[in-house]
Amino acid sequence: MFIGALNENITPEFYLANTDIAYPPEVDSKGYVWRWGNLFDCAVDIKYTLEKEAYVGQINLGLGGAAEVNVFVDGVRVAVRDASKPVHVNLSGKEVTLRARGNYVDLSFKGAEIFGFYPDDDEPFILPTPKKLAYSGERVKIGSFLASCVDGMYAADFLTDSLEERYETLPKGDGIALSFEIAKDYDDERYTVSVTDTEASIKAGSRLALLWGACRVIDLWDEGSLPKIEIDDKPDVPMRGFHMGLPTVDKIDFVKKFIRYVLLPFGYNHVILEFNGDMRYDRHPEITEKWLESERLYREGKGERVMHADIGAEGTSLEKSEVREIVDALDGYGIEVIPEVQTLAHIEYITNTYPEFAELGTFMKTATEQELKWIKHPHIPEHCYCPHNEKCMAIVRDIIDEVVEVVRPKRYVHIGHDEAYHLGLCPKCKEKGAPRVYVEHVKALHDYIADKGLKTMLWSDMFHTNMYYTGEHFDFVKRELPKDLMLLDFTWYFHLDTDIEDFLLPEGYEIMMGNLYSSHYPRYSSRIAKKNMVGGELSTWTAVSEKKFGEHGKFFDAPYLSEMLWNAYSYTENNRASLTALIGQCIIPEMRDLMHGRYDLFLADGEDSRELVGTFPGTDERVPEELLYLGLVEPKDVMKVGERYDRLIFEHATLNPAPRICWQNLTPVGAYTVNYEDGESVSVPVVSAGGILYIKSNYGLPIPPNYYRHQGYVGTWFADPTYEYRTPEGEPVLLLGQVWDNPHPEKVIESVGYLAENGEYAVLLSAGVLGIRLSDTK
């Protein structure tokens, strides 16, 4: 599918606004211009007629000197607040008009850039976008799968299971064979898919790349056939990672599904798995016992939670065999596992057990009031250990040994080392100074890990001169440390106007963009193109669960970021609105149903089997005139149903915005009550930024402040965009369809009601409730 500039070969027409009177500009070396002495405060319409109806995602206006600008798509107005910035349109149409009003200065126009896609394009939407794709609509029947090597057989089995899961149909022998082959002349991450009248093949340089080819076949499969197609693809950058903690035992199955349905198909090649006190260590079981005791006291309200307990199995622990389940799942696909062992800082899981190891704890016993003033976070005295304490270091080495034994990493061990607030404080460390203490400790662990045949990875915030956690700069750190360290540069969001990697690249380090959130990373294209910028990783700093990943927008961020990393050298922010729409329409619904094991309902949905269950008719003076076509949901309203449904989709929005504070739970709005004919009822919670958004929101559009970087795409997992339009004033209108799978599809639903919980932002606007049912529920 073509995604990009829609008007490259289209010449605009110029009219006096709201008329058919031609109003051509002058043309000079800088483009078009209307002189102010002729234009005054009149308005000009600049019209583009596209090749056919398109989804218009974004427009770069190219206008200067206008007092006011509006955009119209087939007559629907889009308000423009700042003509110097890209305009997010998110409307379908064929005629695009820019209306610019004069401001008693020359009005200039360099030409607009209209970005979008054609919804009826015959080519499929594939993400990440293949480098080379030649497509024909003609289809070829596939009769069997053929593989002669272990990796090929693994990929064939994966494809068989995936097709059976989705369609309950497999090749039946009445077509050509699809072969799987490891090609020795391919790079490890290159794959090709070729389908002709007589041959079909997936070739790749590794098992993982073969599976990427199989995922493309899944994208293209239709009733036992594939289109004639040639795909030749490989990623631009070598490091494309996902960072997460350990799950609770009951969430291991969720992690396996997340790997299969999210990380694998979108081209991620490694997972950074963080370890704290959340795995039972054979040599030091007391660490895990203290970890569990501290979590128990926290939940009883008798103590503080240990740092990172939320992402560390939610304060519980796993046995090594349970961790190995996750590692084996990743290994099976060929996805590399990089263990992150928290060392030096964020090591409360160690100092909680051995408080005598804490650097600040020792220092505070003798510190003066003046010395305490410049200590960062004195309320966390256990945050760093003293690296000169040999008993402590022996335990650290033991932990690394046990983690490496379980994970069996192929290349790297991540040693953490971020936010080392408390260095150079105790008498031994103070004598050397914090920077040298830091360098010596990194070198010691680097050499210890190198003896295992592995390299070291770490966060790089302590390399930067602007990180002054202990009152000293670390200017010389970058020069003293080994250059084979892999650095994760994550403090970009504290310095949005600076390319912080430029401080480290001249030293020869390889750098990954750490905590790379596609929603907020600035100047990505120019920065990823620099020598030794080798990729990035998407981080989760929350409990490992569908609920938390969904609330933080990680299911959306993963496919979006995959395009940025896979096609790092061709990605453009101009396609953001288009990619956002396509991910919301084509990827998230399928991904969610696969995660839930409900692909049958996705297929039903795809066949337009949604039907209107009913509407909430109420309205009053609180509803703006331009939204009167939506019903106001009152607590007294009850929607009669009288049918069986497998799934309900609540199309709704809040009349007013609800507060959202990062790191706190999302704001409850209310709950629908689904009442069954037999008297039983089920509550369906409605949570702002979860399954519902403010009516004047844009789907998937990141909130600009970097404060929201960790939750960049709220409202994108539990609900899908079902209606996007504009008010007469050009403001956005968005309805989300919150998806609810009925736990009792065999029962007749008698009615649906709603109970508000939280003030004015609990007032709901509704377009109604849709239902999907399979044949056996009718």
Stretches found by the model and what they are:
Residues T196-V437, K443, G712:
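Feature activates predominantly on carbohydrate-active enzymes
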Residues K47-T49, Q58-G62, T97-R99, E113-F115, ...:
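Residues within well-ordered beta-strands of beta-sheet-rich folds
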Residues E123-S136, G152, E325, G334, ...:
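Substrate-binding groove of N-acetylhexosamine-processing glycoside hydrolases
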Residues Q58, G241, H270, R411-Y412, ...:
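Residues at the N-termini of beta-strands
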Residues L63, R592-K778:
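N-terminal/edge-of-domain interface segments
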Residues N38-A43, E51-E53, G57, L61-Y118, ...:
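Trp- and acidic/polar-enriched beta-sheet ligand-binding modules for extracellular glycan
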Residues M1-E51, G62-G65, F117-D121, G597-D600, ...:
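Disordered, acidic Ser/Thr/Pro-rich linker "stalks" and the adjacent N-terminal cap
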Residues Y118-D233, L458-Y468, E472-F474, K483, ...:
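Acidic, contiguous N-terminal accessory segments
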